[in-house]
Amino acid sequence: MQILLANPRGFCAGVDRAISIVENALAIYGAPIYVRHEVVHNRYVVDSLRERGAIFIEQISEVPDGAILIFSAHGVSQAVRNEAKSRDLTVFDATCPLVTKVHMEVARASRRGEESILIGHAGHPEVEGTMGQYSNPEGGMYLVESPDDVWKLTVKNEEKLSFMTQTTLSVDDTSDVIDALRKRFPKIVGPRKDDICYATTNRQEAVRALAEQAEVVLVVGSKNSSNSNRLAELAQRMGKHAFLIDDAKDIQEEWVKEVKCVGVTAGASAPDILVQNVVARLQQLGGGEAIPLEGREENIVFEVPKELRVDIREVD
């Protein structure tokens, strides 16, 4: 059985930065460190940080006075940010800079009194944080997930209207929604640069190339990871058997029985150790040496806050 690896796969710059912020805070300040929401949507990462003293909470009221608080990579609303400011807390922001870009787009639209439409998945923390950047009562902020949502939507003023997107959406699905928005609201204005992040786009492009060769595609990622779900869905749409797995233990032998080629990729919040474990399990089931496919090179790095820029090896 041939094993192919998608390229790129796994951690993106925003996830790397967010995890480093929590790790460095633990090294510098010691446990406990409070993190609002899972810092990234990966069970292995969250469990590892929890074992080292990170406490994951959903409400600022759960954080004691004088504590260290970190916002997750998904970002938070202005209301949450203001609540944290009102408390005796030391706050570090692990929001992905590419999510912050979308926040700024919404905030600008709010200041101008333009209504805004966000394309995203209801209930996702990134969506909640982005929607929470809009505060102008004279305007409006709306959420759509599909072309059907667009055709049902009514706004106050179609002449002053803009749209943004969640950063981890399906590129193809989002294109369909944007097409519907432009037909429904001809004067709507979009972002100068695509809101779907480079890592999401690159990983979807990579899984498309992977699925062209593999009969079965395994996506390493947690069930609550938006970008990981989109990878599995894309492979399924291409007619392949695709499975979203947290780790090697989730692999069922019948998935790869008599399969000649299996492809492996990982969502942007899944560490490479999990991919290595999956490959090892596939090799136990008859797989050969893993072959990485050619793909787009990624060299983007997002710096941690200057207060946390320390070599953790130097910290006792």
Swiss-Prot record:
Dimethylallyl diphosphate binds at residues 41, 74, 124, 225-227, 269. CDD domains: lytB_ispH. Keywords: 4Fe-4S, Iron, Iron-sulfur, Isoprene biosynthesis, Metal-binding, Oxidoreductase. Binds 1 [4Fe-4S] cluster per subunit. Pathway: Isoprenoid biosynthesis; dimethylallyl diphosphate biosynthesis; dimethylallyl diphosphate from (2E)-4-hydroxy-3-methylbutenyl diphosphate: step 1/1; Isoprenoid biosynthesis; isopentenyl diphosphate biosynthesis via DXP pathway; isopentenyl diphosphate from 1-deoxy-D-xylulose 5-phosphate: step 6/6. GO terms for molecular function: 4 iron, 4 sulfur cluster binding; 4-hydroxy-3-methylbut-2-enyl diphosphate reductase activity; metal ion binding. The active site is at residue 126. GO terms for biological process: dimethylallyl diphosphate biosynthetic process; isopentenyl diphosphate biosynthetic process, methylerythritol 4-phosphate pathway; terpenoid biosynthetic process. The keyword Metal-binding applies. It catalyses: isopentenyl diphosphate + 2 oxidized [2Fe-2S]-[ferredoxin] + H2O = (2E)-4-hydroxy-3-methylbut-2-enyl diphosphate + 2 reduced [2Fe-2S]-[ferredoxin] + 2 H(+); dimethylallyl diphosphate + 2 oxidized [2Fe-2S]-[ferredoxin] + H2O = (2E)-4-hydroxy-3-methylbut-2-enyl diphosphate + 2 reduced [2Fe-2S]-[ferredoxin] + 2 H(+). The keyword Metal-binding applies. InterPro entries: LytB/IspH (IPR003451). (2E)-4-hydroxy-3-methylbut-2-enyl diphosphate binds at residues 41, 74, 124, 167, 225-227, 269. [4Fe-4S] cluster binds at residues 12, 96, 197. Pfam families: LYTB. It comes from the Bacteria. Its cofactor is [4Fe-4S] cluster. Its EC number is 1.17.7.4. Isopentenyl diphosphate binds at residues 41, 74, 124, 225-227, 269. Catalyzes the conversion of 1-hydroxy-2-methyl-2-(E)-butenyl 4-diphosphate (HMBPP) into a mixture of isopentenyl diphosphate (IPP) and dimethylallyl diphosphate (DMAPP). Acts in the terminal step of the DOXP/MEP pathway for isoprenoid precursor biosynthesis. Belongs to the IspH family. This is 4-hydroxy-3-methylbut-2-enyl diphosphate reductase. It comes from Shigella flexneri. The lineage of its organism: Bacteria, Pseudomonadati, Pseudomonadota, Gammaproteobacteria, Enterobacterales.
